[in-house]
Swiss-Prot record:
Lineage, broadest ranks: Eukaryota, Metazoa, Chordata, Craniata, Vertebrata
Residue(s) carrying Phosphoserine: S134, S138, S318, S320
Protein name: Alpha-2-HS-glycoprotein
Cellular localisation: Secreted
Family according to the record: Belongs to the fetuin family.
UniProt keyword annotations, A-Z: Disulfide bond, Glycoprotein, Phosphoprotein, Protease inhibitor, Repeat, Secreted, Signal
Cysteine disulfide partners in this protein: C32-C349, C89-C100, C114-C132, C146-C149, C208-C218, C229-C246
Matches recorded under InterPro entries: Cystatin_dom, Cystatin_Fetuin_A, Cystatin_sf, Kininogen_Fetuin_HRG, Prot_inh_fetuin_CS
Positions of the UniProt region annotated as Disordered: 257-288, 320-350
Gene: AHSG
Domain Cystatin fetuin-A-type: from-to ranges: 27-133, 144-254
SMART domains: CY (SM00043)
């Protein structure tokens, strides 16, 4: 009897090994311009823009690499490398990304470089790992295209800080509504001719009227209405001329900032730039991940020409157990049977350039 039971076990074991290989359990290398690859990359760009706390929104420019891994028990993960370009829409602007203009080379463009892992499950995309950096175009390349165009200058430059404060004071003097205070200086350029300072900055409304802006109590939270200003402060004999235009965004309810795989986190309003914020304003807490080791989202450095995308994400992976680092492959069981005869040439990558390359 024992021999018969053992024989049945061996038969079942042999049957398991002789089962045909199930397709779809191996790594795939789709084309960078494949519609599904682009959909995964666009999901990554949306995730990026949801987490940008300073500076500007970004758009997809080019997909450099893609690998697709199966994920047990279901779904698959797109391992992506793609480039982005900075737009003229501020991170707090509610304008749809499709309506945002890409910053041109003559405006000193900024390029982003992202590594993301995007999970596709039940037809839905979600980001499980994200890492991005961004750099402005080189000064030499800008000069080749436009020798006289002004270049980016550090936002803590004394002329830049003065221009932002002077422009904000002029806006508050003309504004009959709420008093606004400086939230961040987003970018700046020193213009040689005519001698002037161009600055773009974000503002936030206080609970006081513009006429009462000098009252210390006017700095109290909550601050739910933001605006974005563009200003030029021209140097004149015996003084200066200030030109400023501000767009005030509709009041938005404070919503929780999404995290990969629905990991919960606190969501305070964007933190003010410590280099330009009023001394009396309270420090704003930054995001912290609720699960696992506590790691915070560090503010960008004070001396900078742009807001690097590296400060958009906390230094932590997804709270999901399926998340993995940028160079760590997910655990995959590869079949023991060859899937094809001979080496298969990789599909075309990188993909097309949607705007321009810098």
């Amino acid at each position: 009897m024992k021999f018969f039971v053992l024989f049945l076990c061996l038969v079942q074991l042999w049957g398991c090994h002789s089962t045909p290989v199930v397709l779809g359990l191996e790594e795939r290398n789709p084309a960078c311009d494949d519609p599904e690859t682009e959909a995964a990359a666009l999901a990554g760009v949306d995730y990026l823009n949801q987490h940008v706390r300073w500076g500007y929104k970004h758009v997809l420019n080019q997909i450099d690499k893609v690998r697709v891994w199966p994920r047990r028990p279901s779904g698959e993960v797109y391992e992506l490398e793609f480039d982005t370009l900075e737009t003229t829409c501020h991170a707090l602007d509610i304008t749809p990304l499709a309506n945002c203009s890409v910053r041109t080379v003559t405006q000193h463009a900024v390029e982003g470089d992202c590594d993301m892992h995007v999970l596709k499950q039940d037809g839905q995309f979600s980001v499980v790992f994200a890492k991005c950096e961004s750099t402005p175009d080189s000064r030499e390349d800008v000069r080749k295209v436009c020798p006289q165009c002004p270049l980016l200058t550090p936002v803590n430059n004394t002329k830049v800080v003065h221009a932002a404060n002077a422009a904000l004071a002029a806006f508050n003097a003309q504004n009959n509504g709420s008093h606004f205070e400086l939230l961040e200086i987003s970018r700046a350029q020193l213009v040689p001719l005519p001698v002037s300072t161009y600055v773009e900055f974000a503002v936030v409304a206080t609970d006081c009227a513009a006429a009462d802006g000098t009252d210390p109590a006017c700095s109290g939270p909550p601050k739910k209405q933001y605006g974005f200003c563009k200003a030029t402060v021209a140097e004149k004999l015996g003084g200066e001329e200030v030109s400023v235009t501000c767009t005030v965004f509709p009041t938005q309810p404070v919503a929780p900032l999404p995290q990969p795989d629905a990991a919960s986190s606190a969501n305070p309003p964007p933190a003010a730039d410590p280099a330009v914020s009023p001394p009396s304003s309270p420090s704003v807490p930054v995001d912290s991940v609720a699960l696992g080791p506590k790691r915070v989202l560090l503010p960008p450095p004070v001396h900078r020409e742009h807001y690097n995308l590296r400060y958009s994400f906390p230094d932590v992976d997804s709270a999901s157990g399926e998340a993995f680092g940028p160079r760590q492959k997910p655990k995959v069981t590869h079949p023991g049977v060859a899937s094809g005869v001979g080496p298969v040439p990789p599909p075309p990558c990188p993909g097309r350039i949607r705007h321009f390359k810098i």
